[in-house]
């Protein structure tokens, strides 16, 4: 559901529930927030290099050049499930159910998709196999 229409805030930090977040991420959250507001951008996705992922099966979502995200045939960075977004990027969405990939692709096409690299280990509860490896 598109909750942006019913909210009053301009900027949002969102966290996916299937990533194992811990206190080591606090520094990265703070750095992301500082970068986001200092550079007056409208989106910032936390990404990690594939070799920092507990689940080695991830193929990669993006590549990162400076702080710009883009997609190629082979991608070396994984989206962690954390992003800071400004409500303005949702203005053209006229439906209640949509995929964030639609917005990311649009921003990427305009070369306005930004990323921030985390140096933390990325643990995503992909499936029961990964869950069992953690225990």
Question: Regions from the language model: what does each represent?
Answer:
Residues 3, 60, 130-132:
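Short low-complexity, flexible loop/linker segments enriched in glycine and/or proline
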Residues 9, 40-41:
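Short, high-confidence coil segments that cap the C-terminus of an alpha-helix
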Residues 12-13, 20-33, 37, 50-54, ...:
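Catalytic-core segments of class I nucleotidyltransferases/pyrophosphorylases
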């Amino acid at each position: 559901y598109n909750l942006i229409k019913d909210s009053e805030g301009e900027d949002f930090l969102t966290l996916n529930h299937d990533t194992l977040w811990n206190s080591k991420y606090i520094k990265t959250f703070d750095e992301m927030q500082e970068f986001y507001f200092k550079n007056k951008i409208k989106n910032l996705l936390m990404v990690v290099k594939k070799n920092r992922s507990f689940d080695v099966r991830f193929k990669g979502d993006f590549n990162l050049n400076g702080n710009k995200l883009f997609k190629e045939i082979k991608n070396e960075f994984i989206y962690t499930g954390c992003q800071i977004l400004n409500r303005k990027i949702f203005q053209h969405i006229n439906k209640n159910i949509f995929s964030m990939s639609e917005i990311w692709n649009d921003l990427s096409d305009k070369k306005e998709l930004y990323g921030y690299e985390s140096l933390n280990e990325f643990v995503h509860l992909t499936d029961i196999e990964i869950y069992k490896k953690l225990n």
